[in-house]
Amino acid sequence: MLLLSCNNQETYAEQKEKESKAISSFMDRDITVRDADGFEVCKVGKIVTISEEQFQNQGYTTDTTKNEYVLFNNTGVYMQIRRMGTGEKLEQGKTARVICRFIEFNILGDSIQLRSDVNVWHPKPDIIKISNNSGSFTANFDTEINGGGAMYHSYGSTSVPSGWLVPFSYINIGRQDSPEEGIAKVRLIVPHSEGQVNATSNVYPCFYELTFQKMRD
């Protein structure tokens, strides 16, 4: 069956090929993400890909001095761990609420599409309710506490992008109790198949910088 999109009648296969090329170009461009006023938001740089085997051999870490990202072949998600975070990993059989703040950069659009690390969203961060089910993570955006954050209000869905769940096997999700501590921070390249609902529908990849911190009980 041939799948067609309304995007100039490109086939789905053509859209996926365009996405793949955009990701490759993004990784090779030594890019700096800037806001609408031209101010630097984060320096991405030229990305070095490592395998899952190398990632494991390095103790499930990525060398930020080399700008390493691990590629997970089963999903196409690339991940860099900037900070492991405080506390502990989410244990099997446990559920937690996690505060998330992020920058979302549309790689095909070459611009910031959404960000919650700005003043307007500080009182209403995205809250992820996440469960570890025998090493498999499921999650949704919890709207009961604050009515939902930037992701819910922008895309109208409580579904957490599958790509966002990848880091939880490797990071800690405690709270920052002193200035010397740092909460978990990761960077991701997420293809449409693992992305938010709009990316999935329109076949575009996103770059994310995200922080995660466990809510107080």
Predicted segments with their positions:
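Cross-family detector of peptidyl-prolyl cis-trans isomerase
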Residues: 6-217
